[in-house]
Curated annotation (Swiss-Prot):
EC class of the enzyme, as a word: isomerase
Lineage: Bacteria, Bacillati, Cyanobacteriota, Cyanophyceae, Synechococcales
Pfam families named among the record's database cross-references: Aminotran_3 (PF00202)
A GO CC term attached to the entry: cytoplasm
Main subcellular localisation: cytoplasm
Signal peptide: none
Catalytic activity, as annotated: (S)-4-amino-5-oxopentanoate = 5-aminolevulinate
Name under which the protein is recorded: Glutamate-1-semialdehyde 2,1-aminomutase
Pathway: Porphyrin-containing compound metabolism; protoporphyrin-IX biosynthesis; 5-aminolevulinate from L-glutamyl-tRNA(Glu): step 2/2; Porphyrin-containing compound metabolism; chlorophyll biosynthesis
UniProt source species: Prochlorococcus marinus (strain MIT 9313)
Transmembrane intervals: none
């Protein structure tokens, strides 16, 4: 596979931007080799600057659930573009998307739009503390909630009740209020509440983990968190930036029947444009300025182009049979991946829900981030490169979920599984 232009462009980028990228995982540091520089995307495919075509299972890290550059989304954006790129003032499109989100997501009675998932999580953290009058929060090892200081706590070091900064520049005093527990471990959460009476504002988690690889909640875990937070007067927050509108139209909370107090969203609700949102019970959301005293603002929040793309995307997702089709596609994919690995005698465990999937190159089960770290990252790097050579674009990290879309055809899945069979055989 010729990647001459990608290599030249990335070489130049390294002189212009830290690491040559605008987000670290794109640099391929954890899988080796040079990153691919893309030229265009359409449907289930991405083309690089050298003309190579890939079947894409990243989908812009989640937003492209209808497929890249869906024709109806593009037409809607072209029409909206004629009216301007940004208003910096209220627009009716905000109302339309807000109504759609409120109708879909069980916990959301009011919503505030922002510009990214990180911004949504930063804002909801402030809101948790403002509403409860408490400073501490509980997060789970391996769960990612953006790069705000208080969320950058070292993961995978056991039940670290006093978080240590996971990045230079983050003061210990900032992360000292962040308590961590292993995912799927209710007893650890109970202990944190017992050790910090009347001090914990809430619990935030990815209800389905996608940033430590793909890890699903065990039966009773989400329900247990709901009971514990109510018992201790704390808030339960679902970070559905990744799972929202992807594992069901109402997200993980609709799928599992557990309603949090607050929810953060992003990715899918912007249809591929920068967006984030947070919402929840009206009595909590009414604390947000200008209705209440908790300040949060944004120059480009409620951007008409992002609202337009989000509205059209959700309209497409509401069509009959959408999620059944996504589920079937993803189940077929992960089943074939597991079979391919086992045929090559490669240890593997994996799973899927809705249009999310993931696998670890180790014996299962994987219940939390500590378990996930047993995956063979060196072997994954070899597998990633082998798949790339065969025209399949997987996330360049052993600790990221994969995504399918409505654009992935049966032929795409079969081509992908053929590549997995060949690649596992080559790297085993």
């Amino acid at each position: 596979m010729n990647t001459t232009r990608s290599q030249a462009i990335f070489s130049a980028a390294q002189r212009l931007m830290p690491g040559g990228v605008s987000s670290p995982v794109r640099a391929f540091r954890s899988v080796g080799g040079q990153p691919i520089v893309f030229d265009r995307v359409k449907g289930a495919y991405a083309w690089d600057v050298d003309g190579n075509r890939f079947i894409d299972y990243i989908g812009s890290w989640g937003p492209a659930i209808c497929g890249h550059a869906h024709p109806e989304v593009i037409v809607a954006l072209q029409d909206a573009l004629e009216k301007g790129t940004s208003f910096g003032a209220p627009c009716e499109l905000e109302n339309q998307l807000a109504e759609m989100v409120i109708d879909a997501v069980p916990s959301v009675e009011m919503v505030r739009f922002v510009n990214s998932g990180t911004e949504a999580c930063m804002s909801v953290l402030r809101l948790m503390r403002a509403f409860t009058g408490r400073d501490k929060l509980i997060k789970f090892e391996g769960c990612y909630h953006g790069h705000a200081d208080m969320f950058l706590v070292k993961a995978g070091s056991g039940v670290a009740t006093l978080g240590l900064p996971d990045s230079p520049g983050v003061p210990r005093s900032t992360t000292s209020n962040t308590l961590t527990a292993p995912y799927n471990d209710l007893e650890a959460v109970k202990e944190l509440f017992a050790e910090n009476p009347d001090a914990i504002s809430g619990v935030i988690l990815e209800p389905v983990v996608g940033n430590a690889g793909f890890i699903t909640p065990e039966p009773g875990f989400l329900e247990g968190l709901r009971e514990l937070t109510r018992e201790h007067g704390a808030l339960l927050v679902f970070d559905e930036v990744m799972s929202g509108f992807r594992i069901s139209y109402g997200g993980a909370q609709a799928r599992f029947g557990v309603t949090p107090d607050l929810t953060t969203m992003g990715k899918v609700i912007g249809g591929g444009l920068p967006v984030g949102a947070y919402g929840g019970r009206a009595e909590i959301m009414e604390m947000v300025a200008p209705a209440g005293p908790m300040y949060q603002a944004g120059t480009l929040s409620g951007n008409p182009l992002a609202m337009t793309a989000g509205i059209k995307t959700l309209e497409l997702l509401k069509q009959e049979g959408t999620y059944e089709r996504l589920e079937s596609t993803t189940e077929r994919l992960i089943k074939g991946i597991l079979e391919a690995a086992k045929a090559a005698e490669v240890p593997i465990t994996g799973n899927s829900i809705g249009a999310m999937f993931g696998f670890f190159l180790c014996e299962g089960p994987v219940r939390n981030f500590e378990d996930a770290k047993a995956t063979d990252t060196e072997l994954f790097g070899k597998l990633h490169r082998a798949m790339l050579e065969r025209g399949i674009y997987l996330a360049p990290s052993a600790f990221e979920a994969g995504f399918t879309s409505l654009a992935h055809s049966e032929a795409d899945i079969e081509t992908t599984l053929k590549a997995f069979r060949e690649s596992f055989a080559a790297v085993a």
